């Protein structure tokens, strides 16, 4: 079942044609090593290559992928940050057929030696992943937004995280079959074309109240009795800065980063970690890598051993990434 889920993700979410797995002698689940995209019978434009790379970088499923065309086979580092000024992300050294055969053979992936080779040590790094880059960028946005708005840091943080969640829902919904939230919700209730339009028209707090009611939870809530001071400060503050960050209208190197992210492919576990990461004053990123979380969940909740009655407690819960991953496993069961 773990292979089936991996294949489904590769095909439906990323459009990959094949997946190469690494198998283990013990009871560990097979791990996807790379995705393969077959373009031997169809044209591949530069725009399509950039789209594939953007999605792969955001998705954090495998560190390397291959694109096969009629006259070439190219290997790509899925951890390399997208750059819209570049046409191709394939390493030049890899284009040389003989060297490619030596460095990118199946056996090196089967035994894991590929990742330990000297030539590969500067590539496929978590430090360059969308996960770390997003959190790093959001820390800069949070600091700037708090300074410009003058809001209390906890109010500014809560507002930013709520806006991030809404943006996440909006962009994921754009690719769904219904598309209700992205195309209808804002227009129906606030006569706005999208989330950033809601912010610019000064209706953010009204939207949060509506979402708090519709979602039947406290994640979007600003209590009208207990948080009067906070609500007043939000009403009086120039919140449009948030819209500029979210749609990347600030044309400098610091904030256009938002355009790099595809929330249809960014793992939900990343979003779950944002609040805790922004809460700390440290410049370091302490986000737990998804591969570690997956390993622990596989050990505690094997996919091939579904349970009808299962209880789980995370006694040192921080970002909630383990609980999110565990919930996804229960859904898979």
Feature locations, PLM:
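Nucleic acid-processing catalytic cores of prokaryotic defense/repair systems
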Residues: 1-96
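Alpha-helix capping and helix-coil boundary motifs
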Residues: 42-49, 100, 148-156, 181, ...
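Extended, non-transmembrane interaction/recognition domains
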Residues: 76-125, 166
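Extended, well-ordered alpha-helical scaffold/bundle regions in very large, multi-domain proteins
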Residues: 174-220, 313-326
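Long amphipathic alpha-helical segments that form oligomerization/scaffold cores
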Residues: 204-205, 209-243
């Amino acid at each position: 079942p773990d292979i089936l889920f991996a294949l489904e993700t590769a095909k439906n979410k990323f459009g990959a044609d094949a997946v190469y797995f690494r198998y283990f002698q013990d009871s560990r689940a097979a791990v996807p090593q790379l995705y393969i995209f077959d373009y031997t019978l169809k044209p591949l434009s530069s725009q399509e290559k950039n789209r594939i790379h953007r999605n792969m970088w955001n998705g954090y499923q495998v560190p390397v992928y291959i694109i096969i065309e009629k006259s070439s086979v190219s290997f790509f580092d899925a951890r390399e940050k997208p750059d819209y000024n570049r046409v191709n992300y394939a390493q030049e050294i890899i284009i040389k057929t003989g060297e490619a055969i030596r460095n990118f053979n199946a056996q090196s992936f089967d035994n894991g030696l590929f990742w330990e080779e000297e030539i590969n040590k500067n590539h496929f790094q978590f430090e360059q992943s969308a996960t770390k880059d997003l959190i790093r960028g959001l820390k800069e946005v949070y600091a700037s937004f708090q300074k410009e708005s003058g809001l209390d840091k906890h109010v500014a943080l809560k507002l930013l995280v709520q806006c991030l969640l809404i943006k996440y829902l909006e962009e994921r919904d754009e690719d769904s079959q219904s598309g209700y939230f992205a195309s209808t919700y804002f227009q129906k209730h606030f006569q706005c074309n999208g989330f950033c339009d809601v912010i610019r028209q000064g209706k953010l707090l009204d939207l949060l109240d509506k979402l708090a009611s519709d979602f039947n939870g406290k994640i979007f809530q600003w209590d009208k009795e207990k948080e009067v001071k906070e609500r007043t400060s939000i009403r009086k503050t120039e919140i449009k800065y948030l819209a500029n960050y979210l749609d990347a209208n600030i044309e400098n190197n610091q904030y256009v980063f938002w355009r790099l992210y595809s929330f249809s492919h960014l793992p939900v576990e990343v979003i779950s970690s944002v609040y805790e990461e922004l809460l700390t004053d440290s410049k370091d990123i302490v986000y737990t890598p998804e591969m570690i979380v997956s390993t622990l969940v596989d050990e505690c909740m094997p996919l091939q051993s579904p349970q009808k009655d299962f209880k789980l407690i995370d006694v040192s819960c921080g970002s909630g990434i383990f609980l999110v991953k565990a919930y996804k496993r229960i859904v898979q069961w």
